[in-house]
Amino acid sequence: MHQQKRQPELVEGNLPVFVFPTELIFYADDQSTHKQVLTLYNPYEFALKFKVLCTTPNKYVVVNAAGAVKPQCCVDIVIRHRDVRSCHYGVIDKFRLQVSEQSQRKALGRKEVVATLLPSAKEQQKEEEEKRIKEHLTESLFFEQSFQPENRAVSSGPSLLTVFLGVVCIAALMLPTLGDVESLVPLYLHLSVNQKLVAAYILGLITMAILRT
């Protein structure tokens, strides 16, 4: 005897549901957007029943709110916004598509679709552009702040070591030269001509370094 091939039992709520798009945006100033289409796909080897639920059903008309999808087929669900008022701008509504096997009532899977009413497509594009520019400026400021301390360190003026060397060189040049007999400075502080030339050379380098900063 041939045994009948049994389909594996599906767990409630775990079946992936394929819907496109997953977000609906209606624009008040564009009537062509007041009617939009959801497409439900059935890639499986068995037929599916579907049902469309909504958090605010009084604001929408759903054509084909319930029905069936054949195996490896799709069905279009038309959704019309019938309450286009400014008080609904920016309010997020949700549609839920539940699917089940034709022979059973339990929901095998579900998918939520977000719906939003906006005043104008142009305003939406303008807001997105302003947001993009703001993010770009924020990033620019972030990088400038990151490198600012380094710039300050470079342009903060001569270091203490440079100033100290400059003072030493000036003091060396002011000391008497070897051979000056009439000096009150002790003899061991008398410098030779070569030593003073070295001090003058170093002082010149220090002066150039200070001027560059």
From Swiss-Prot:
The chain crosses the membrane at residues 159-179, 191-211. It is found in: Endoplasmic reticulum membrane; Golgi apparatus membrane. Keywords: Endoplasmic reticulum, Golgi apparatus, Membrane, Transmembrane, Transmembrane helix. The keyword Isomerase does not apply. Plays a role in differentiation and/or proliferation of mesenchymal stem cells. Proposed to be involved in epithelial-to-mesenchymal transition (EMT). However, another study suggests that it is not required for EMT or stem cell self-renewal and acts during later stages of differentiation. It is a multi-pass membrane protein. GO terms for cellular component: endoplasmic reticulum membrane; Golgi membrane. It comes from Pongo abelii (Sumatran orangutan). A motif (Nuclear export signal) lies at residues 205-208. This is Motile sperm domain-containing protein 1. The keyword Iron does not apply. Its main location: endoplasmic reticulum. Residues 16-143 form the MSP domain.
